[in-house]
Design a protein with these regions (language model features):
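ATP/Mg2+ or Mg2+-diphosphate-binding catalytic cores
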Residues: 244, 255, 277-317
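ATP-binding pocket architecture of kinase catalytic cores
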Residues: 33-150
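A glycine-centered beta->alpha junction motif in the catalytic cores
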Residues: 65, 109-121, 143, 163-164, ...
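Short, glycine/acidic-enriched loop or turn micro-motifs at the edges of active sites
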Residues: 64, 114, 200-202, 220, ...
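Active-site acidic catalytic loop and adjacent metal/ATP-binding pocket
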Residues: 37-48, 54-55, 59, 93, ...
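Active-site activation/catalytic loop segments of kinase-like enzymes and analogous catalytic loops
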Residues: 227-259, 271-289
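Conserved N-terminal boundary motif of the eukaryotic protein kinase catalytic domain
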Residues: 25-33
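An alpha-helical support segment within catalytic cores of ATP-dependent transferases
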Residues: 10-25, 140-198, 300-317
């Protein structure tokens, strides 16, 4: 059994910088917001004492060696600025120390938002449609690559699981190998470059009932085909809630976008290929809401991938 990780809290220099970012006097409490028990946290909720003894809650983000790179914290900050410019539902950037001179590390401070990112064991079609619509609002921003918001060819672009399998760094299966060959021979579809969240799943969405109030954690944001985000969300919902869920996500996305999504099977396959061969630790729920084990979640990934391959156009030889 893996040993649980004890969260390492930010040091005094970082906390002093954070307090000064909201004209506060001191940090009253620090809480890790990480969902992982086996990795250190790079995201913290701070309660800061401010003028007239009023407390302010904010979110601090810092890098973690060999996991959350400096560039990812900087990308998150740039994405939040862009989200605010376009009126998107996301935290607002309060302060950023992108060279680490003031805080001793790359660090950002953003607003703390209400809402829950907990994954419900059962989900309504309305919530799935709302999730699709939330992503479509981001993808409505036409955008070319720029500093700190690079082109993204797949979700969570810092990972490339398909390449790891090709190089023998991770075991593969006949299905994953066939899918990788099909996707590579298909070629990347052409589409307008848009703003991408880059890591869309239930844990990066804040909810009040069936209303998505914000997308959070933009550290792999960038630009590219909207299918990167849509395929990622469709796959995540298939993993969590079964093979009927992606259709509701697509319906919500298309209704919000006012148009049909393109190359859906291709981007579904790309998303499925950028997952570990065995889906250990990935959440999924049975129809009765009971949690699924890794084998069952892996089979859901494989079923989603098979459907994508069945719908992917076969190249003319």
């Amino acid at each position: 059994m893996a040993k649980a990780h004890t969260a390492k809290m930010p040091n005094d220099q970082v906390l002093r910088w954070a307090a000064s970012g909201v004209d506060g006097t001191r940090v009253l409490s620090t809480e890790s917001l990480s969902r992982s028990d086996h990795r250190p946290s790079g995201t913290f909720r701070l309660r800061i004492e401010g003028p007239a003894a009023r407390a302010t809650d904010v979110v601090l983000k810092v890098p973690i060696p060999r996991w959350i790179l400096n560039a990812m914290v900087i990308t998150n900050a740039r994405a939040l600025q862009l989200a605010e410019t376009h009126g998107l539902a996301a935290p607002r950037l309060i302060a950023a120390d992108l060279d680490g001179r003031a805080s001793g590390t790359v660090a950002t401070l953003e607003t703390f938002l209400s809402g829950s990112a907990d994954l419900p064991p059962m989900v309504s079609a309305a919530r799935l449609r709302e999730a699709g619509a939330a992503v479509a609002r981001v993808n409505a921003v036409v955008l070319e690559s720029q500093a700190d918001l690079p082109h993204r060819a797949r979700p969570i672009a810092v990972d490339d699981r398909a390449a790891e399998r090709r190089r023998g760094w991770m075991p593969t299966t006949p299905l994953l190998q066939q899918a990788d060959e099909r996707v590579r021979s298909h070629g990347v579809p052409g589409a307008a470059s848009v703003f991408l969240h880059g890591d869309v799943w239930g844990g990066n969405m804040l909810w009040e009932d069936d209303r998505c109030v914000a997308l959070i954690d933009w550290k792999t944001a960038g630009v590219g085909d909207p299918g990167v985000d849509l395929g990622s969300l469709r796959m995540q919902m298939a993993l969590q809630y079964g093979q009927d869920a992606p259709a509701h996500v697509l319906e919500g996305w298309q209704r919000q976008a006012g148009r049909a999504a393109t190359a859906v099977p291709y981007w579904d396959a790309v998303a499925a290929l950028n997952t570990p061969t065995v889906m250990q630790g990935w959440p999924g729920f049975a129809d009765d809401g009971s949690p699924l084990d890794a084998a069952a979640v892996t089979e859901r990934r494989d079923a989603f991938l098979r459907t994508a391959l069945d719908q992917l156009p076969t190249p003319i030889s």
